[in-house]
């Protein structure tokens, strides 16, 4: 199945445009741990920048025809990562795009190199307490915080797992072009994203 911006319902289009210029072709990739706010601030930042927004995990579920937990359970993480790699590379066919990446997407060296070569990578950084509060405050299925039966782990075990995964992933996240404080109100994080992107896009 061919992928395009016009056809995929995982994309949200932005009605607003910067008043004085269009940035040179730029893809913005938002990375960070689960619950760092990528899918929350991404659409608002895209609207401010006049760019489409794409949530890579939602695109994966659209192509797989099932939820990510179901994909993990039925076909395994390897299949999920295969789709993730393929769909990430297809983003290079579209200019001026804000993409929220899955929390583990840039652990793959090739994915990380691709995103840095083809766009501006922004790491949304938040402390463990903030991440834990966010994941325990919603009912989103998060396979990495569940036991083998699909039951959410107790809070203390979730903290331990988040700390361990953050330690493992931090070098990949910190390879981003910029690190932004995501432990702030949404509007502040959005504003900071817009500042960084427009500063990068303006001609020297």
UniProtKB/Swiss-Prot annotation:
ATP binds at residues 35-40, 142. SUPFAM superfamilies: P-loop containing nucleoside triphosphate hydrolases. The keyword Cytoplasm applies. It catalyses: shikimate + ATP = 3-phosphoshikimate + ADP + H(+). The keyword Transcription regulation does not apply. Its EC number is 2.7.1.71. Pathway: Metabolic intermediate biosynthesis; chorismate biosynthesis; chorismate from D-erythrose 4-phosphate and phosphoenolpyruvate: step 5/7. Its cofactor is Mg(2+). It is found in: Cytoplasm. Its main location: cytoplasm. It comes from the Bacteria. Belongs to the shikimate kinase family. Monomer. Catalyzes the specific phosphorylation of the 3-hydroxyl group of shikimic acid using ATP as a cosubstrate. This is Shikimate kinase. It comes from Salinibacter ruber (strain DSM 13855 / M31).
